[in-house]
């Protein structure tokens, strides 16, 4: 569970105010399969298997990633439909997504706290993407008039008919090894050919596996 203020890498950036994963995870020779921005939180899958890392982050495979997004304002049906249909972001249309309003998930307050304006209400969205362009979630919500205040990735769908890998049970900064069953599922990805779950558009949508 990557906390706020931590880069999705194990080496610090010189002069950066952000921390790095090595401050939280004492496991050598693993790397993030898909990044989260330093000001985002949530699920990172770490692996030493380069093929698995590539497989999970290749946008051509279209692994759904689920985010909880606290936004400024209250989403209306038209805004949700625009998020789902796809938006022009930096000259390129995003792939169709899944978007819905959700109740406050009751997360612990972020440290540092989000910046709220007393006169503007906030609300939560569940947003699922199959691609991961740079700061895509934030750009998408801003494009429909709902600036992002807080962003967490909560699940990654392995597209194998089983439940997605989930952040459940992990506090910020905590990590765990995958279970034997999860390990088998991940290895199964490397044996599967494109088909089940479908490809998401030939991989022309830019960097994969991020979005946050």
Could you tell me what each predicted segment is?
Residues 195-212:
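Intrinsically disordered, low-complexity arginine-rich tails of RNA-binding/processing proteins
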Residues 1-195:
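RNA pseudouridine synthases
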């Amino acid at each position: 569970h990557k906390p706020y203020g931590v880069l999705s890498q194990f080496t610090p950036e010189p002069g950066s105010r952000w921390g790095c994963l090595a401050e939280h995870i004492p496991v050598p020779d693993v790397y993030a399969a898909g990044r989260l921005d330093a000001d985002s939180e949530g699920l990172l899958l770490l692996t030493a298997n380069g093929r698995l890392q590539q497989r999970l982050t290749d946008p051509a495979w279209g692994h759904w990633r689920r985010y909880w997004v606290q936004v400024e304002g209250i989403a209306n049906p038209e805004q949700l439909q625009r998020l789902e249909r796809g938006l022009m972001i930096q000259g390129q249309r995003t792939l169709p997504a899944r978007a819905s309003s959700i109740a406050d998930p009751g997360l612990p307050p972020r440290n540092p706290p989000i910046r709220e304006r007393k006169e503007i209400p906030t609300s939560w969205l569940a947003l699922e993407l199959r691609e991961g362009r740079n700061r895509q979630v934030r750009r998408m919500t801003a494009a429909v008039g709902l600036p992002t205040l807080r962003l967490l990735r909560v699940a990654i769908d392995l597209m194998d008919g089983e439940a997605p890998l989930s952040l459940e049970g992990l506090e910020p900064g905590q990590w765990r090894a995958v279970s034997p069953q999860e390990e088998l599922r991940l290895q199964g990805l490397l044996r599967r050919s494109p088909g089940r779950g479908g490809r998401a558009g030939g991989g022309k949508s830019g960097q994969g596996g991020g979005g946050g």
